[in-house]
Amino acid sequence: LSLAIFDLDNTLLSCDSDHAWGEFLVEQGAVDGDAYRRANDQYLRDYQAGQLDIMAYLSMALKPLSEHSEEQLNAWHQQFMACKIEPHILPQGEELLAWHRQRGDFLLIVTATNRFITGPIAQRLGVDDLIAIEPERENGRYTGRVEGVPSYREGKVTRIRQWLEDQPALTLDDAWFYSDSINDRYLLEEVATPVAVDPDDALRALANERNWRVLSLR
């Protein structure tokens, strides 16, 4: 049983689900449109440059979850899935998941996007488990705070190692990891088979230097 790990945004999806959720909230009038959109765009640029202050970003991104009922959030999420996510699920990404499934591998998505956004996407893609940023909940509502270590950059390695403590049959020693982003270099360096998927320029350069496989799912 080998572990096949996948980044989500711009790897299995041709969009960034976190940024798309921010756009969706603006369209719904759920947040202050111009200010939120400007901040959302800036944080995406910071992420792409490998310079994101994750805690500053999360204080903005998780706040709307604390301001609305779970019922409202779930209704929005269904609309969001239909209009913002389904059109961006890459058919070749689904084929790659199917190939690993056929091999009998354990399919794991690890993402720096929070579980509220990504839980239903992971279910839709049919993976075995999901490691995501965990928004804290109290009494059935989100608090706007984050729980535990954010699964971002080195935090992805930390969270996977914590997760592996409960998975005696699985190891990184024969694992695959697919990602598009230089932010994921730390986990790519830990696995047996790192694969750069439609990589950003910095990851493409690193992949060439390390002789890592480069793949396009588009």
Question: Where do the language-model regions lie?
Answer:
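C-terminal cap/substrate-recognition subdomain and adjoining C-terminal extension
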Residues: 1-2, 75, 82-218
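Metal-dependent phosphoesterase signature
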Residues: 56-92
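Amphipathic alpha-helical segments within well-ordered protein domains
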Residues: 22-23, 62, 192
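Active-site neighborhood of HAD-like aspartate-dependent phosphohydrolases
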Residues: 1-49
